Amino acid sequence: MRRRAWIVGLAIALATPWAAAAELRPSWECLPADTAFMVRVPGLGEFWKTIQERTKFGAVALGPKRLEGLWQAIASIQDDEGEWSLEQYEESLQKYGLETSDLVKVLDAEFGGSLVLRHRDKKTPLAMMLAWLEPGNEGAGKLLAAIRQQLEESADEEHAPKRTDIELAGHEVMMTAIPVIELDMDGVDLPDEGEFDEAALDALVERMKNAKAQKTGERYTFVAVMDGRLLVGSGLTTFADPEGDADEAAGVEEMRRIFATFLEAHSGGGEPALAGVYREPAIAAAALPGMPLVEIVAMPSVLVSVLNAESGLDEATVQARLATVGVDDIGSVVLRQNFDAGRWKATMAMTLPAPRHGFLEILDQPCDASEVPAFVTREVAEFGQLSLDLGAAYKTVRQLLLAQAEGEQVANMYSVADMQSQAWLGVDVATVLSGLGTRHWFLTFPPQIAEVLAKARAADESGEEVSTVADRLAAVWQIADEGPYVKLLGRLAQLAGGGQLEEEQGFKGVRIPGGAAFYVGRGHLVMALGEGVLEKTLAAIRTPPQGDTSLRESDVPRRAAELLPARPARGYGVSDATRTGGSLGMLRDLAEAMEPDDIEDESMRGVFVALKDLLPSAREMEGMFGIGTTLLRMTDDGLLYETAWEMPAP
């Protein structure tokens, strides 16, 4: 039964994506206007093939032998845990007339899914998933037959799904009602805090074993085949009592209408309900050339509309509250990823017209130039800059909060904070924040994974406690007046138990045991975390690097600007994975530093060795990745976040 349930879930899950046949409209065009979320994958198979053939990453890391080895390792893990073996998986597919190649072919075509949210007067809002894929006539027939066979096999089981064949919009539809069974937890109380010992846990488990199972709702699934396309709808109904009520029936009828409209629209004409989303200037400007991987679209207005209706508040009150935040005129959000001319690109856009207001007014502050400061060394793997006057943002938030109904209480809180700041630092909170300047710099150094693991092993043997932080980060601010920050660090030193600030290369500061270090000097405030980061950062501020040791003077900013023009932006970043290998390189370094004995579960040690052998070597990873860059900008139409990475050819 477990394997049957798994294959049913797989078959239905595969139907959560989309595709378009020539005779039918694209399925996304058939979605209703109250669609809150949609994801489309135009062709994963072709995209995968392109990455394998045109990038070194694909040729090496995604090569057939490595993928086969990975599949074998995963199957080995499942087999060791008694879940399923590779042979059992293949037998399960064959039993239902399917092969692995049938599932792989599904990914070659377009697929997608969506979520519809609909308000219902005096009833729970209806959430329904609509999905589509295009496996072709043969593939769709196989999947539908497999689902039917599994439903027939489970017909005699307790709480078995109930299948009903119906007709909607002139199409045959298989409707399935799957009971939702939950334990009746009335009278089963959790132990009070401090009483959750082993005995209490055993007693709780025993009470749960004896709890009565009851039917609390049903999940309805609708499946139809249309010209080689598999269309699926699914939604949940809940009962007011175990026997059900009229609300459950009303929910089913609403789902039937939604799915019928979805089917009918495939052969219809006219403008798609979501066409207006794609016409929003911010969304249209986020289009990407090349081969797309995925497009995700969210319509917050649909969710807001449902929540408004559920709140019972009048529209004016709701709009006023949204305006305070600054999202009363928010539009759609889109996320796109693609590969084009040796570059992996991603963009996220949100319709949020200028001028922004409410809390989001802070996003309209002037932006600094996107550039790397002189003190950043070539050793840094990632550099980021946030352009924002925190003091001005603080004042904006304070002004808005003071205007609210609880304004007097908020004013008292701000007054206390300012008085404390004046007493300790000689200036108010806003002045302290603005004193940091508008450029907030963040530096990421390559992690020292091997060193940290070695320390952890030694500490485990000796019983000593040591810091095992592998991350190596720094945040730097250029400040005009060091006085308030020296006083602030003095207070921090007292709290840390040291009492006095320490001297380091002409800087004053404090090191938090097992944590970060904070230092002030030479017109800069530095926060550092990780072995050697403080010393390197302070030295670079004292004597800025030049030539090959300088990130600013290297080819990294130039190559990054070729990916995305380095215009003034709210956020800016560059990264260099040519040496570190990015996330894959970190995984490789972790695997190389680990030993089988580091894994407590003995049964997993063999799997670890197998997975370790599958990772590319340092030599294989040379030239696998290149330069990356990010930009976060506010346009007249909204927010635009862009990223791009070099993906060198084999």
List PLM regions with ranges.
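Bacterial N-terminal signal peptides
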Residues: 7-17
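C-terminal regions of mature proteins
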Residues: 478, 616-650
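Loop/turn-rich, solvent-exposed surfaces of beta-rich toroidal or solenoidal domains
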Residues: 463-482
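Structural boundary/hinge residues at secondary-structure and domain interfaces
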Residues: 21-216, 273-334, 339, 345-466, ...
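Helix N-cap motif at beta-to-alpha junctions
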Residues: 134-139, 235-239, 479-483, 530-533
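Bacterial N-terminal signal peptides that target proteins for export
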Residues: 1-7
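Short, intrinsically disordered low-complexity segments
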Residues: 168-188, 507-534, 612-625, 635
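A conserved glycine-rich beta-strand in the N-terminal activation segment of trypsin-fold
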Residues: 212-306, 513-605, 611
